[in-house]
UniProtKB/Swiss-Prot annotation:
The lineage of its organism: Eukaryota, Metazoa, Chordata, Craniata, Vertebrata. Belongs to the major facilitator superfamily. Monocarboxylate porter (TC 2.A.1.13) family. It comes from the Eukaryota. The chain crosses the membrane at residues 17-37, 59-79, 88-108, 110-129, 154-174, 176-195, 305-325, 343-363, 375-395, 397-416, 431-451, 464-484. Residues 38-58, 109, 175, 326-342, 396, 452-463 are extracellular. PROSITE patterns: MFS. Residues 1-16, 80-87, 130-153, 196-304, 364-374, 417-430, 485-500 are cytoplasmic. CDD domains: MFS_MCT5 (cd17421). It is found in: Cell membrane. GO terms for cellular component: plasma membrane. This is Monocarboxylate transporter 5.
Length: 500
């Protein structure tokens, strides 16, 4: 007889507060020290042009490598997290960013800086950001939107870091400024120690990664308890070949633990359910097959929700940086003073920060599903950018800037909560890592594409049209979420029928 029970779990409810706010503090500092300083690269851009007499294209590669690696190194960050754990990975990322800035102070050329200020900080940023993002999902559920928005608001302090960076360069030269930046970022080492591990077991077990169910006897010792993050050698009991006589085989009650996935019936024999007879199991030591597959898990590519999220994430990241980079340049072509144009950037930063906080709080009220908010914000961003060429005066440009910052802040605050909802809170590391890899390609190619459009048309209106189109297209995949949910339910029903 087979009977179903819910997964016995030692800890299933996120704290939604308590020590979780310390994790939010760490995530906030990551956004301030790492992401905020990345945005101040424009100041070093001018300095490097004068120091090394390089072209804009050559020096632009430094910033492009740094920005794109924060996303495209996501799969590597996921693997490192599985091997070392979140806390060690975060500390490693801190040393990479800090060391990259310090070594850059001895730079002798642009290729040198591409490695020390592009590659190293880019990898470190990926490690820091992904670890903080994943750990915060373990501590928060009901308040995930608000907690993420508070953490991301650190990026809004860029308008304060820009004059601070200029002050350091004027006072200590660019070499001294880089050394000080490296020292400041080292504060993330004690901050990373706040990432207290939390061991939980949900219905969608993260270690098992939905690769199948576990069948066990009703004895407590048969429960399968997992530890998040680290991939270790484990001993798994499995059924031993035997020639028991029929009369010697007693009736066994089996308990189905957890939610089963559609992949259950296709798993190899060594990954089949754990069967126990008479409350006793025949055990043999071997290295966990799950652990071997953990470092290179391609099962995500059979998950429709992964494609839905990745399509939306890729195109929205492709679109986001284009108006950000070209806003001031477009204002200059309209005859607006550079100082007035710089106010647009400051207003955008402040508005986006406030918008993220409000968006996160609204999403946590669960009036509608979070991806519905996300989809609406993306569409509004697209419409706003498609109408941007109509803004030909400073007041109209200011109105466009405020509207775009409101809608952009709205969807940026919901990227992580939507990811958690679509991934069903399982394999968040891998889900975010692989999706970020494709987003990194978009970040690397977006500004050059927009630049090519300007070179071809000699106007920035084409860049805003391109951005608006990408935003509209990024929302399309989210319309397929209900279809994917129905498909998932059919697969679950079919699996339950097969087990019965």
């Amino acid at each position: 007889m087979v009977k179903k029970e819910k997964t016995p779990s030692p800890y299933t409810k996120p704290l939604d507060g308590g020590w979780g706010w310390m994790v939010v503090l760490h995530f906030f500092l990551v956004n301030v020290f790492v992401m905020g300083m990345t945005k101040t690269f424009a100041i070093f851009f001018v300095v490097f042009q004068e120091e090394f007499e390089g072209t804009s294209e050559q020096i632009g590669w430094i910033g492009s490598i740094m920005s794109s690696l924060r996303f495209s190194a996501g799969p590597l960050a996921a693997i490192i997290c599985d091997v070392l754990g979140e806390k060690a990975t975060s500390i490693l990322g801190t040393f990479l960013v800090s060391g990259g800035y310090v070594i850059s102070s001895w730079a002798t050329g642009i290729p040198f800086l591409c490695v020390t200020m592009g590659l190293l900080p880019g990898l470190g940023s990926a490690f820091l950001y992904q670890v903080a993002a994943v750990v915060i999902t373990k501590y928060f559920k009901k308040r995930l939107g608000l907690s993420t928005a508070i953490a991301r608001s650190g990026m809004g302090l860029t308008f304060l870091l820009a004059p601070f960076t200029k002050f350091l360069i004027d006072l200590y030269d660019w070499t001294g400024a880089l050394i000080l930046f490296g020292a400041i970022i080292l504060n993330l080492v004690p901050s990373s120690m706040l990432l207290r591990p939390i061991h939980s077991q949900s219905n969608n077990n993260s270690d098992i990664e939905n690769k199948g169910s576990i069948l066990s006897a009703t004895e407590p010792e048969a429960s399968y308890k997992t530890e998040t993050s680290k991939c270790k050698e484990t001993q798994e009991p499995f059924i031993k070949d035997s020639t028991m006589k029929k009369s010697e085989q007693p009736t066994t009650t089996l308990t189905v633990l957890g939610n089963q996935s559609e992949e259950f019936s296709n798993r190899p024999h060594r990954n089949r359910p754990l069967l126990m007879s008479n409350g006793k199991s025949h055990k043999k030591k071997f290295v966990s097959w799950n652990c071997k597959q953990k470092l290179l898990d391609i099962s995500l590519f059979r998950n429709p929700f992964f494609y839905i999220f990745t399509w939306s994430f890729l195109l929205s990241q492709l679109a986001y940086f284009i108006p950000t980079f070209h806003l001031v340049a477009r204002a200059k072509t309209l005859g607006i003073d550079v100082m007035d144009a710089s106010y647009l950037v400051s207003v955008a930063g402040i508005t986006e920060t406030v918008s993220q906080l409000i968006s996160g709080w609204i999403a946590d009220q669960n009036w509608i599903k979070k991806y519905q908010y996300h989809k609406s914000y993306l569409i509004l961003c697209g419409v706003t950018n498609l109408l941007a060429p109509l803004a030909t005066t400073f007041p109209l440009l200011m109105a466009y800037t405020i509207l775009f910052a409101i809608f952009a802040g709205g969807y940026l605050a919901l990227i992580l909560p939507v990811l958690v909802d679509l991934s069903k809170n399982s394999r968040v590391h891998k889900f975010l890592g692989y999706a970020s890899f494709f987003a990194g390609i978009a970040v690397l190619s977006g500004p050059p594409i927009a630049g090519w459009i300007y070179d071809y048309t000699q106007t920035y209106t084409g860049s805003f049209y391109f951005s608006g189109t990408c935003y509209i297209l990024s929302s399309v995949s989210l319309f397929f979420v209900p279809l994917a949910e129905r498909w998932k339910r059919k697969q679950s029903d079919l699996l339950r029928t097969t087990i019965k």
